[in-house]
Amino acid sequence: PGKRVLIIGGGYIGLEIAAVARKKELQVTLVESQERLLKRVACSQTASYFKNLHEQNDVKIIQGQSIVKLIEKKGAFAGAVLDSGEELHADFSVIGIGVKPCVYLAKGCGLELDNGIRIDKFCKTSDANILAAGDCASFPYKNQRLRLESVGNAIEQAEVAALNALGHSKEYNAKPWFWSDQYDTKLQIAGLSSGYDKVV
């Protein structure tokens, strides 16, 4: 209790860590470089709701600013400096700023890449003898290519890839679904946060 944590990143991971840290009575400052929380994964109304929830739980939220420098004291982390020049002092930091797929093995095999390992609707790569699934795989979804970083996608896609490795011809039909637990609130999202007509 009482320790100061600096959380860098206002996506699901950053917000979930903030909620747990507050339950443990830590002082929490969260920095998000985008103009709002959950920018890549949720609509502005959802982001606003969760911003208010965290502020009601005494999380200091800074949006639209980036970390430009880390502060060291006696060889240990002591905080960070924002692009505004403001110094944020903390005892430790947690960084959750997105997912970049690790594709060096696929690249070394000469596989086609497209924001991850490019797969078709059967989870096959550009080499039909190699299949891929999970957070590293970019797959066709409607009129675009998509890479989902979620447990549900990883499990369902792996099941399809395994069946196809055994000789089946099963198509992967993504049904994007996400959840997040923060304080006593459970968020569940079905679908994607772009291309919608209205928020209900």
Residue ranges: model-predicted function:
Residues K23, E55, V59-K60, E72, ...:
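Generic secondary-structure signature for well-ordered alpha-helical cores
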